Amino acid sequence: MRASTVLVVAASLIVASALVAQETAPAKKAPASAAARLVMTHAAELKWTDLDPKGAPGVKIADLWGNHAKGAFGAYIKLPAGFAVPLHTHTHDMRVIFVSGTYIQAPEGRPEVRLGAGSYMMQPGGNYRHTTSCDKTSDCVFFVESNGAFDLKVVETAKPVKNP
């Protein structure tokens, strides 16, 4: 066989293989329509779980999207009436809308702020030190959204040194 014939046969096989591969490749899915992406959840259908049964007994969370333990999320959080958290920080910023109850936050060294239903707060992450509590008259429910996983780092207070 001449070199030109071998070249033509090889080229024909390559083209034929490419055509067969195109026909057998799975078709790309069309993007979902807006109606197919719609999510609606009744309040009674929320899946409330314990946020941290050991460190925050009674505090519940219901993820709406994402996963609060792994990364970006949107969720409802419920604090029991009278619940309080000592001085602490969070790694990530949180945007919060209060749904019910009276939420109380005291930035370190400043007076407490009481926020009721309909109030909004953008709480910075990083070194923003504050206490958090819920008024004892009723549970506090709020919506929180963050670009990172939820965490709570209690600030260790310096203990006085005792002289021997």
Q: Which functions belong to the PLM regions below?
A:
Residues M1-V9:
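Bacterial N-terminal signal peptides that target proteins for export
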Residues A69, E108-N127:
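Short acidic-glycine-tyrosine-enriched beta hairpin
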